[in-house]
Amino acid sequence: QASIESGALIQYDREIKFANEKFDPIFAAYAKIDVETLATDPQHAEALKVGQRLFLQNCAQCHGSDARGQNGGFPNLTDDDWLYGGSGATIVKTLQGGRNAMMPAWLDAFGEDGIAEVVEYTLSLSGRQVDQELAAKGKTRFMACAACHGMDGKGNQMMGAPNLTDNVWLYGGSKRSVTETLTYGRNGVMPAFSKTLGDDKIHVVASYIYSLSNK
């Protein structure tokens, strides 16, 4: 049994090596073309098909096969709402090194009543119907949130702090979800793919992702 398994592993390694030798030059050639061009120039359509296959193999488990994400911290990659920025270079950086996002819990600082006030104000930023009296009180407390999200609530891509004015919610935009976010905080982790895919394949995946919101 051990001999059979060992033989199978050796054969698998040989097949991987053969595939790499065959396709690595193709990925290297793609990597010489900037992400934006690779994503939008029709003559590079085959590269996007390859990028899509790599996406389905490595990214779809979290972001979905349609790349539209899901509640629970997995962002939609098909819109123009980017936590860290949507340039080709930024997408490559995200794929290479991953991201670690942390939203602190505010229950100790605000208390339950204070949380309720900030929730009302936060929801008002995207035009929602809210309790105006609570929202007015929440606006004062929001000063503590402005260090990351900005005084206008439009976020900060350098920090990965989301825009709170566009009604796009990573963990859900219901009053209950926003209350949970403020009460308990959030920790979002995007894994690094540098070792898994290598820079050339990452370049192709980034081009596919870029193409989804730049059609």
Show the residue positions of the predicted features.
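Extended, polar beta-sheet/loop recognition surfaces of beta-rich domains
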Residues: A2-Q11, G73, T78-L107, E117, ...
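Flexible loop/turn segments at secondary-structure boundaries
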Residues: G155-N156, G172
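Axial heme c-ligation environment in periplasmic c-type cytochrome domains
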Residues: G72-T78, Q96-I115, T122-E133, M159-N163, ...
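Conserved catalytic core of two-component sensor histidine kinases
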Residues: L56, E112, F142, G172, ...
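Sequence/structural segment immediately N-terminal to covalent heme-attachment motifs in c-type
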Residues: Q43-R68, D79, K93, G97, ...
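Periplasmic c-type cytochrome electron-transfer domains
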Residues: Q1-P42, Y84-T90, A105-T122, K195-Y210
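Solvent-exposed, acidic/flexible segments
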Residues: H44, L48, Q52, Q70, ...
